[in-house]
Amino acid sequence: CEKIWEKDNYINQIAAIRKSQIDRFKKEKIITVEDLCSINLDNPNFKKINSNALSNLKTKAGLVQKKRETGKSDYIIAETENNKGLYKLPEPNSADVFIDLEGYPFFGKRGFEYLHGLYLNTGTKIEFKYFWANSLNREDETKNFIDLIEYLKKHFDKYPDAFIYHYNDYERRALKDLSNEYSSTFPDGVNLIDKLLRQEKFIDLFRVVEQCMQTSEKDLSLKTIEKFYRKERSAKIKTADDSIRLFDDWCATNDQKF
């Protein structure tokens, strides 16, 4: 289906467009991205679509169409209200933490969190610190979580003005689930996560990007927008799915080369 949609230049190629919006456009014979580029924003038939959303969709359609014609990716930073987009970012702090969790969904009801990765300033240098499960069992997951919480507690005791940055809601949700899961045996976990949530220390960069960045791409995944700020990854693992497959192979073979 995706190949057909791309070939037909169907309007679902625009990032974050909703089904209800697509249905409204189709009633007006707006079927392709190119059609959307030329819509009249004052058309009363589009009044059920928020005017700002309609304008943004037209702008994104122009970027998508331009890439289709030139092969070049592009983006613009849009104006937003004071409480949205880039305005949601706090003042940078040298002790800010950037966190990424990797989970294995095919284990139990809630899956298995096998990797907590942190990128942060330790006071002497910027480094990547990780907590990795050596086997697929809850004991390793528990130890990982305890080690992570103890590390974060020390960090925020030392740097109370720091924030935790993540991309999309997975990390915040997974940490909350883990803290609740182990609250009876490790209350420090739920206490710290609740405290960080109350203090609004978790900054979701996906929401920032979603509200202020309009691109020529079909989605706003981290892998997709990386092309705008870094060179292409040289590592074999490029997506969360790649990581899951590799962890699955590692569990099956216990091959340390992985």
What kind of feature is each model-predicted range?
Residues 1-24, 38, 43-58:
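Long, low-complexity intrinsically disordered regions
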Residues 14, 23-25, 34-35, 106-109, ...:
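Short helix/loop capping segments that flank catalytic or ligand/cofactor-binding pockets
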Residues 28-109:
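Long, highly charged low-complexity segments
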Residues 91-147:
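Metal-dependent catalytic core segments for phosphate chemistry
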Residues 12, 83-88, 102-106, 150-155, ...:
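Generic recognition of flexible, low-complexity loop/linker segments
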Residues 120, 128-244:
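Conserved DEDDh/DEDDy metal-dependent 3′-5′ exonuclease domain
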